[in-house]
From Swiss-Prot:
This is Protein PHOTOSYSTEM I ASSEMBLY 2, chloroplastic. CXXCXGXG motif repeats lie at residues 103-110, 114-121, 140-147, 151-158. It comes from Oryza sativa subsp. japonica. GO terms for molecular function: protein-disulfide reductase [NAD(P)H] activity; zinc ion binding. Keywords: Chloroplast, Metal-binding, Plastid, Repeat, Thylakoid, Transit peptide, Zinc, Zinc-finger. Gene3D superfamilies: Heat shock protein DnaJ, cysteine-rich domain.
Length: 187
């Protein structure tokens, strides 16, 4: 980044005199900015030795467009903002390699919140009698009041890969217990 530079010079322009508007002679001098962009090493040396121009005609010839100024400022900002992130030796992925792999659905706990009651264990049932409706809180029929269910992805193990678990002969009994609510999470 030795050859990239952006110089900003501020110069006062002479006051505007006009024959048609006599009030223009009493206006203060306007400040004009001069921005020059140097993208190569040769240009950077020329930019560092350049002096602000005082003649209005010469300044108009050398003033870059607004689009070029904006492109230069954006490029310098992006280069300076992205610099430190490229030099970081340890990223987020290197931290994840040291941790053991866990199930993505339950984060390794083996249990998930019940989707019917939201983990409260209570289920809102509607009791309709003639003109008014009454809500009754009963035990959740999905989790049987516990608020948690066994994770259906890892089957309560907390591991992301349990391919051989369902091939075992006792796996059918395990699944039946899990779906009927007889197997408890964390057991």
């Amino acid at each position: 980044m030795a050859g990239v530079g952006c110089h900003f010079l501020l110069s006062l322009s002479p006051p505007l005199y006009s024959i048609r508007r006599p009030a223009a002679a009493h206006r203060p001098a306007k400040a004009r900015s001069h921005i020059s962009c140097c993208s190569r090493h040769d240009d950077a040396e020329a930019c560092s030795t350049s002096k602000p121009l005082t003649n209005g005609k010469e300044e108009e010839k050398t003033t870059p467009s607004r689009r070029k100024c904006l492109a230069c400022l954006c490029a310098v900002t992006l280069i300076s903002a992205s610099g430190p992130t490229m030099l970081t030796p340890n990223g987020l992925a290197s931290d994840m390699m040291s941790k053991p792999a866990v199930c993505r659905n339950c984060n390794g706990s083996g249990a998930v919140l019940c989707d019917m009651c939201g983990g409260t264990g209570k289920w809102k049932a509607l009791n309709r009698k003639r003109a008014k409706d009454v809500y009754l809180f009963t035990e959740c029929p999905n989790c049987y009041g516990r608020g948690k269910l066994v994770c259906p992805v890892c089957l309560g193990t907390g591991l992301p890969n349990n391919k051989g678990l369902l091939r075992r002969p006792d796996a059918k009994k395990l699944l039946d217990k899990m779906y009927n609510g007889k197997i408890l999470p964390d057991s």
